[in-house]
Amino acid sequence: MLIIPAIDLKDGACVRLRQGRMEDSTVFSDDPVSMAAKWVEGGCRRLHLVDLNGAFEGQPVNGEVVTAIAKRYPNLPIQIGGGIRSLETIEHYVKAGVSYVIIGTKAVKDPAFVAEACRAFPGKVIVGLDAKDGFVATDGWAEISTVQVIDLAKQFEADGVSAIVYTDIAKDGMMQGCNVPFTAALAAATKIPVIASGGIHNLGDIKSLLDAKAPGIIGAITGRAIYEGTLDVAEAQAYCDAYNG
């Protein structure tokens, strides 16, 4: 299982939100490229970037920062989400050196777009499913749909999606532990690999994910915990490697 540091971008800075609320953000660095360097030097093997402005505006806003990080680390798998709602945007990021694009809102509102994106950019597409009480949220979490996460995930199995990033909104940024039972249930219900996100606080939460014994869980995204020092990236990755080894 990969430990994947998150860099959330708002107005060019690296921030963390609580429960997806733009008005409840903490700025951790005004230099996201240097922040990426910190996690790379700490031994991370993949980075998770989110264009928060893009998620709300429906198109990339912090694209220059994403490109700068991708160019600095050409051999590091990088995934980007937030405002990806056209093939042109995906093409832009892929050409910039980004390994995976995360389709969120567009995947919920226009599932056929996911299949189209997978055909155009095979192996590059991840679907981001953000949920509250099992229902999918969209538009930067501002809207809660009537769509069940597991039902939607199954729809994407035939499309060639590389992974699903599952985020529990109620947990995100709160550092109260991630929703292990639902994450494991999602991984068991779909053939698509799952990346857990939201609420990871410390090594105990990583252990809980591993102890779920769900082979479909391939990664865990962590944000506030690594910024506030309750989780060490290198230590957590070493723990995962030893557990799997």
Curated annotation (Swiss-Prot):
EC number: 5.3.1.16
Keyword Nuclease: no
Keywords: Amino-acid biosynthesis, Cytoplasm, Histidine biosynthesis, Isomerase
Amino-acid biosynthesis as UniProt keyword: yes
GO cellular component: cytoplasm
Active-site annotation: D8 (proton acceptor), D130 (proton donor)
UniProt pathway annotation: Amino-acid biosynthesis; L-histidine biosynthesis; L-histidine from 5-phospho-alpha-D-ribose 1-diphosphate: step 4/9
Disulfide partners: none
Localization in the cell: Cytoplasm
InterPro entries from the UniProt entry: Aldolase_TIM, His_biosynth, HisA_bact_arch, Isoase_HisA-like, Isoase_HisA-like_bact, RibuloseP-bd_barrel
GO molecular function, one term: 1-(5-phosphoribosyl)-5-[(5-phosphoribosylamino)methylideneamino]imidazole-4-carboxamide isomerase activity
Domain of life (superkingdom): Bacteria
Reactions performed catalytically: 1-(5-phospho-beta-D-ribosyl)-5-[(5-phospho-beta-D-ribosylamino)methylideneamino]imidazole-4-carboxamide = 5-[(5-phospho-1-deoxy-D-ribulos-1-ylimino)methylamino]-1-(5-phospho-beta-D-ribosyl)imidazole-4-carboxamide
GO biological process terms on file: L-histidine biosynthetic process; L-tryptophan biosynthetic process
Family statement: Belongs to the HisA/HisF family.
Identification of the protein by name: 1-(5-phosphoribosyl)-5-[(5-phosphoribosylamino)methylideneamino] imidazole-4-carboxamide isomerase
